[in-house]
Amino acid sequence: MEALTSTIEERTKLRWDDNNWKHLPKRWGHSFHPMCSYLAMFPPGIPRYFIEQFTEPGDIVLDPFSGRGTAPLEACVSGRVGIGIDLSPLAHILTAAKVDPPSLNSVLKRIDELRIGYKRPNVDDVPDDIRMLFDGRLTLPQIVYLRNELSHRKRVDRFLLASLAGILHGGYNDAMNNSSYLSISMPNTFSMSPNY
C-alpha cells in the first residue's frame, strides 16, 4: 500500500500546471467521439490527460458514469483497457459501440440486409409526442423499422444504433439550412418526459 501511495504522490506532482488538454482543438481526438451528443459531456483531452498521468499501457480504466464513452474510448486509444458503466441505455450503446466497434464490412453488410429487408411498418400506434418530431411519410416509418430490427445485444447493431442516435439527436444545419439530422432541433430544456 505504501508503494501505491508513493506512486500516486509522485504522479500528482507531474506538471499539473501543464494542462495541455485546455489547448487542444475542439474537434480533437478519435473520430468516434462526436458520434452522438450527450449532456454533461467533456472534451476527450481531459480523460486522455489523466489516463496518461495515472495509468500505464495495459492498465484497466473504469469509468463508472461513462455517458457517451469518452473516457473508455480514450483509454483504449491510449493502449489501456477501457470499461464504462452507466444506467442509461443510450450511454451503454454509445460506450459499447466505441470500445468494441465492428468491422466496416460487417456494418455495410448489415445496412444492406436492412435495406433489402425493408417493409414499411404501421406507424399508427406511435404516440403523437413522438410523431411530431419526424416526417411521417418517410423518416418515422424508417425509424420504427430500425427500432424493430436492431438489437442492442449485437455488436454491429449497437454500432448502428449509436450512429443513428447521433443522427437523430443532432442540431446542426449548414449555411443552406440543409440538415444531416432526422429530427427537429430541440434545446436541452425540452424534455420528452410526460408531465415535464
State what each model feature region is.
Residues A3-P57, V77-S78, I83-Y196:
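Nucleic-acid modification enzymes, centered on SAM-dependent nucleic-acid methyltransferases
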Residues G58-G67:
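Conserved class I S-adenosyl-L-methionine
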Residues G69-L73:
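Glycine-rich SAM-binding Motif I of class I
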